[in-house]
Amino acid sequence: MINYAPLWKTMEEKHISSYALIEKYGFYKATIQRLRKNQSVNLRTIDDLCQILNCSVEDIVEIVLEPDVPLPRTIRRQP
C-alpha cells in the first residue's frame, strides 16, 4: 500500500502548504485529494514534489507491505 504520510511531515518541515502547492506551483486540487487519500499519482507528480520540497522520494512516500493481500499473477515475491 502506498502511504503519503511522509509528504505531510516534509511539507510541514519545509513550511509549504497544500494551498501553496495549488496556488504557487499549479497543482490540481484533485491531485492533493488523491495524495490525502493515499491514492496513486503519477511519477511526474512525485518528481515535482521532490523538486519543490528539495527532498528525496523517501521524504514523500512510503510503501507499506500488506502480507495478506494476494499479488497479481505477474508479480512474485521471492522467498
Where are these regions (language model features)?
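A short, Lys/Arg-rich alpha-helix, primarily the initiator
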Residues: 1-20
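Short, charged recognition helix plus adjacent turn
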Residues: 9-10, 62-79
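Alpha-helical residues within the helix-turn-helix
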Residues: 12, 23, 51
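Short alpha-helical DNA-recognition segment
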Residues: 15-33
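Helix-turn-helix DNA-binding elements, focusing on the entry/boundary residues of the two helices
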Residues: 18, 43-46
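The DNA-recognition helices of helix-turn-helix-type DNA-binding domains
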Residues: 28, 39, 64-67
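Hydrophobic micro-packing sites on short alpha-helices
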Residues: 45-50, 60-61
